[in-house]
């Protein structure tokens, strides 16, 4: 059975329609023309560097220089770049796109701070030490689309050896994380960094997680404080502690499948959730009942029984440019 939800909030019009999941055969054709969806499609939309200059880089120095300004630009990454360094700061109006699956940043991550209109697609980021920050950090920023990325570390070290894979903090807003492979990590993705930051975060931190493959994760898949989350069409494999809603967060969880999880959907510190058509694989939903039943954009649901076949092998760096 195919589940389809079309949810339009009152007072909003002209929202771009998008199909979050592409078939394998259509990925290459659609890669260059795909548009941001979910929360990143709101607030004027997220177009990155469309219409700006185009550059291809293959070294750390060239990459750092290419992404820094706020001018419209598309930066293609060709091949791997390895450097043990602090996060590279990304300017507004930027698209960072890996040309293929070899475009991997190792040892350093990306920081989108006090910026807007940023797209990160088809890029790998791995093994960023905690002292160097998150693999992808989004702070004080709005309209960011992270799509078809492969982010990971390992679990051979203790939980504090690496920091987060994709963290959205300090009142960041209108963010979508989609079609991504998030794996082999202790604490994967955090929305809202502190129980004491409610004054700044409340009314912000609107994040969509769609069509993602989470694998071999200990916790934070994701963990949300204060904000609003929509998590759908995702496959969770060997994720011990999955979706954690806390500190008043409201989360809508739909059409997901969990295999090998201890806690699929749960609440600490009074977080809330509404769940529909999820296969928790024997784990339980212990979150407090929430009120988030609709979101202000259109989307399509796969149905929990179809998520694995649609997401595994498609999520991650599967595009070519």
Swiss-Prot record:
Its EC number is 4.2.2.2. The keyword Calcium applies. GO terms for biological process: cell wall organization; pectin catabolic process. It is found in: Secreted. InterPro entries: Pec_lyase, Pectin_lyas_fold, Pectin_lyase_fold/virulence, PEL. One of its GO terms (cellular component) is extracellular region. Keywords: Calcium, Carbohydrate metabolism, Cell wall biogenesis/degradation, Glycoprotein, Lyase, Metal-binding, Polysaccharide degradation, Secreted, Signal. The active site is at residue 220. It is an enzyme of class 4 (lyase). Its cofactor is Ca(2+). Binds 1 Ca(2+) ion per subunit. Ca(2+) binds at residues 134, 163, 167. GO terms for molecular function: fibrinogen binding; metal ion binding; pectate lyase activity. Glycans are attached at residues 93, 238. Pectinolytic enzyme consist of four classes of enzymes: pectin lyase, polygalacturonase, pectin methylesterase and rhamnogalacturonase. Among pectinolytic enzymes, pectin lyase is the most important in depolymerization of pectin, since it cleaves internal glycosidic bonds of highly methylated pectins. Favors pectate, the anion, over pectin, the methyl ester. Belongs to the polysaccharide lyase 1 family. This is Probable pectate lyase A. The lineage of its organism: Eukaryota, Fungi, Dikarya, Ascomycota, Pezizomycotina.
């Amino acid at each position: 059975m195919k589940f389809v939800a079309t949810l339009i909030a009152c007072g909003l019009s002209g929202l771009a329609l998008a199909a979050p999941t592409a078939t394998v055969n259509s990925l290459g054709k659609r890669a260059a023309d795909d548009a941001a969806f979910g929360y990143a499609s709101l607030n004027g939309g997220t177009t990155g560097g469309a219409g700006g200059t185009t550059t291809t880089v293959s070294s750390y120095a060239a990459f750092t220089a290419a992404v820094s300004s706020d001018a419209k630009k598309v930066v293609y990454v060709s091949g791997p770049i390895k450097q043990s360094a602090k996060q590279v700061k990304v300017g507004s109006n930027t698209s960072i796109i890996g040309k293929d699956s070899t475009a991997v940043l190792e040892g350093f991550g990306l920081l989108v701070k006090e910026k807007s209109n940023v797209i990160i697609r088809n890029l790998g980021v791995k093994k960023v030490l905690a002292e160097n920050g998150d693999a992808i950090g989004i702070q004080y920023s709005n309209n960011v689309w992270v799509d078809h990325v492969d982010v990971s570390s390992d679990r051979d070290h203790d939980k504090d050896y690496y920091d987060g894979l994709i963290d959205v903090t300090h009142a960041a807003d209108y963010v979508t994380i989609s079609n991504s492979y998030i794996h082999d990590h202790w604490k994967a993705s955090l929305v809202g960094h502190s129980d004491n930051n409610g004054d700044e975060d409340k009314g912000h931190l609107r994040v969509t997680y769609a069509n993602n493959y989470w694998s071999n994760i200990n916790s934070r898949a994701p963990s949300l404080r204060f904000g609003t989350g929509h998590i759908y069409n995702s496959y969770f494999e060997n994720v011990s502690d999955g979706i954690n809603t806390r500190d008043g967060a409201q989360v809508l969880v739909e059409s997901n499948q969990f295999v090998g999880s201890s806690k699929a959907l749960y609440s600490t510190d009074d977080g809330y959730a509404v769940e529909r058509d999820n296969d928790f694989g024997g784990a339980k939903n212990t979150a407090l009942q929430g009120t988030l039943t609709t979101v202000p954009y259109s989307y399509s649901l796969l149905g929990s029984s179809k998520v694995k076949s649609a997401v595994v092998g498609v999520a991650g760096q599967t595009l070519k440019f």
